[in-house]
Design a protein with these regions (language model features):
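Conserved core of the sugar-phosphate nucleotidyltransferase
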Residues: 92, 96, 116-210
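Short phosphate-binding loop-to-helix
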Residues: 63-112, 120-124, 128
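Conserved alpha/beta core of the MobA/IspD/sugar-nucleotide pyrophosphorylase nucleotidyltransferase superfamily
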Residues: 1-17, 178-231
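A short acidic, often aromatic-flanked loop/helix-cap motif at beta-alpha or helix-coil junctions
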Residues: 82-86, 149-151, 212-215
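Short, charged, surface-exposed secondary-structure boundary motifs
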Residues: 34, 84-90, 216-218
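Short, polar loop motifs at secondary-structure junctions
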Residues: 60-65, 192-194
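N-terminal glycine-rich phosphate-binding loop and ensuing alpha1 helix
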Residues: 8-60
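Short, high-confidence coil segments that cap the C-terminus of an alpha-helix
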Residues: 53, 106-108, 135-139
Length: 231
């Protein structure tokens, strides 16, 4: 019904306009350097293209006031050193960061995370994923890649194939496609899941990426510069 569709579109537009999605960029002190400035800025610039992201916060254990990110629209939140230990998880970092944000009376409708190691991420994907949270009754959605190549699990001397549908694999050993999570590419969830550290529990959905080039990982500026002219 045209009139009903028009009403639903208007309702969604209002919801979209009022929705407050915040994004956290977790960066360890070792990576908060001028050598990695391109990776940091490319992530920030990509997030800024989304009209649905209302605030960007860098969560870091970098001890000095940062001159690396001179941007009034980017909040720097200093976190304890122990949140960079191997025993700590992304959920620990997000929980601490959200608590610091909310302690000033600043609350959001959804919270997302983006790591600097994906400098070629597509800003349109960010919009699509936030809209999924708006439009569907789910707890968390994260970026992913559908892998057709053979995927193995285990130690080198005890490997077991868990998936793969490539023609290079013998037909009797094809187990279907596997989904590789790209959580650091972009993940969006609800604040309650961050507070309760249940980001990856409940009703979870993946958002399959179509352009493999946008999933390339660069862990420093040297890798970024080597690839930049090729893409």
């Amino acid at each position: 019904i045209p009139r009903l569709n028009s009403y639903n579109n208007e309702k969604f537009s209002v919801l979209k306009k009022n929705h407050r999605c915040y994004c956290v960029i977790p960066i360890k002190a070792a990576d908060m350097t001028f050598e990695n400035i391109k990776l940091i800025h490319s992530t920030i610039n990509c997030l800024k293209k989304s009209k649905l992201i209302k605030k960007i916060s860098i969560s870091t254990d970098y001890e000095r006031d940062s001159l690396i990110v001179e941007d009034s629209k980017v909040q720097i939140i200093k976190r304890p050193y122990d949140l960079s230990d191997r025993e700590s998880s992304l959920e620990d970092v997000l929980k601490y960061t959200l608590e610091k944000i909310e302690s000033s009376g600043d609350f959001c409708d959804s919270i997302s995370v983006a790591e600097i190691i994906y400098p070629f991420r597509d800003s349109k994907v960010i919009e699509e994923m936030i809209k999924i949270i708006l439009d569907e009754s789910i707890d968390t959605v994260f970026a992913s890649w559908k892998e057709v190549r053979a995927t193995w699990f285990g130690e080198e001397d005890e490997l077991k194939m868990i998936g793969g549908s490539s023609w290079t694999i013998p037909s009797q050993k094809r187990f279907g496609q596997t989904i590789t999570s790209l959580i650091g590419y972009f993940t969006v969830t609800k604040p309650k899941n961050v507070r309760n550290k249940t980001v990856f529990e409940g009703n979870i959905k993946t958002h399959l990426l179509k352009n493999r080039n946008t999933t390339i990982v660069c862990r420093n500026n040297i890798e970024f510069n080597d690839l930049y002219d090729l893409l």
